């Protein structure tokens, strides 16, 4: 194994040393043109010559290109239409089958038939999305079909009306609750507040003490007025 690797490396060195290196530059336009049709025709011409010499056994070894392709591309093998491209048999061992798009084949004059997947036209739609609803307005339809269409079209309308009714009911309930909350301070009178405040204050210890003191002071003043003569106070300034 190592000897083979040595020979490979030594052989490359000798060949590179015997020939002078040639540098060539190619302008690349970011596109690579693959002449696959010419290569296939070249391979087919060689196979025809070999078939004349060898026979039918060699022709059985080279299978058609379309035998190894999936079922979606089997329509390419139909040679009945002359306007489509036709690929002849060529060996597919360790190679890729390149099919350029139609706009790059012969200036867009020829096209390649490719089967479209049914999932491409699939539209996943939510039931609440009524934007894509198709209303059939053909006059030639029967009355029964028109009645069914009217019933089906009125279904979303009824649902929308019921949703609108529930929304309005919720708004009315919220407004009523807010109105009752705002009317509570208006109905609250100051007399009720004074009465409740006095009741709460009467139960307090300090409040009871103040009431007792006011009563005592009032009784003492009444007794003093009964037996004592009230004299006016002296004037501070003489006018």
UniProtKB/Swiss-Prot annotation:
Major place of residence: cytoplasm
Keyword Chaperone annotated: no
GO CC annotations, alphabetized: autophagosome; cytoplasmic vesicle; cytosol; nucleus; PML body
Keyword Cytoplasm: yes
Disulfide bonds: none
GO molecular function: antioxidant activity
A Pfam family that the UniProt record links to this protein: DOR
Tissue: Specifically expressed by acinar cells of chronic pancreatitis tissue.
Regulation: induction: In chronic pancreatitis tissue, expression is suppressed by camostat mesilate, a serine protease inhibitor, and by Saiko-keishi-to, a herbal medicine.
Protein keywords: Activator, Antioxidant, Apoptosis, Autophagy, Cytoplasm, Cytoplasmic vesicle, Nucleus, Transcription, Transcription regulation, Tumor suppressor
Positions of short motif LIR: 25-37
Location in the cell: Cytoplasm, Cytosol; Nucleus; Nucleus, PML body; Cytoplasmic vesicle, Autophagosome
One record GO biological process: negative regulation of gene expression
Free-text function comment from the UniProt entry: Antiproliferative and proapoptotic protein involved in cell stress response which acts as a dual regulator of transcription and autophagy. Acts as a positive regulator of autophagy. In response to cellular stress or activation of autophagy, relocates to autophagosomes where it interacts with autophagosome-associated proteins GABARAP, GABARAPL1/L2, MAP1LC3A/B/C and regulates autophagy. Acts as an antioxidant and plays a major role in p53/TP53-driven oxidative stress response.
Subunit description: Interacts with p53/TP53 and HIPK2. Interacts with PRKCG, GABARAP, GABARAPL1, GABARAPL2, MAP1LC3A, MAP1LC3B and MAP1LC3C.
Domain comment, as recorded: The LC3 interacting region (LIR) motif mediates interaction with GABARAP, GABARAPL1, GABARAPL2, MAP1LC3A, MAP1LC3B and MAP1LC3C.
Protein name: Tumor protein p53-inducible nuclear protein 1
Species of the source: Rattus norvegicus
């Amino acid at each position: 194994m190592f000897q083979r690797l040595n020979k490979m490396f030594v052989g490359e060195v000798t060949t590179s040393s015997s020939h002078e290196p040639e540098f060539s530059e190619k302008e690349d336009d970011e596109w690579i043109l693959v002449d696959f049709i010419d290569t296939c025709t070249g391979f087919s011409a060689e196979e025809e010559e070999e078939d004349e010499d060898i026979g039918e056994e060699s022709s059985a070894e080279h299978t058609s290109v379309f035998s190894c392709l999936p079922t979606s591309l089997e329509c390419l093998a139909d040679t009945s239409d002359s306007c489509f491209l036709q690929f002849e048999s060529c060996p597919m061992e360790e190679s890729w089958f390149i099919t350029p798009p139609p706009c790059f084949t012969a200036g867009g004059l020829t096209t390649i038939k490719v089967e479209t997947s049914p999932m491409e036209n699939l539209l996943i739609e939510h039931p609440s999305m009524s934007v894509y609803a198709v209303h059939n307005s053909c006059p030639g339809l029967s009355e029964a079909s028109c009645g069914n269409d009217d019933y089906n079209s009125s279904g979303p309308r009824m649902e929308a009306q019921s949703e609108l009714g529930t929304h309005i009911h919720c708004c009315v309930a919220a407004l009523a609750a807010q109105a009752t909350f705002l009317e509570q301070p208006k109905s609250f009178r100051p007399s009720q507040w004074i009465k409740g405040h006095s009741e709460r204050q009467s139960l307090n210890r300090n409040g009871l003490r103040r009431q007792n003191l006011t009563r005592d002071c009032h009784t003492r003043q009444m007794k003093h007025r009964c037996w004592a003569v009230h004299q006016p106070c002296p004037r501070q300034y003489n006018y």
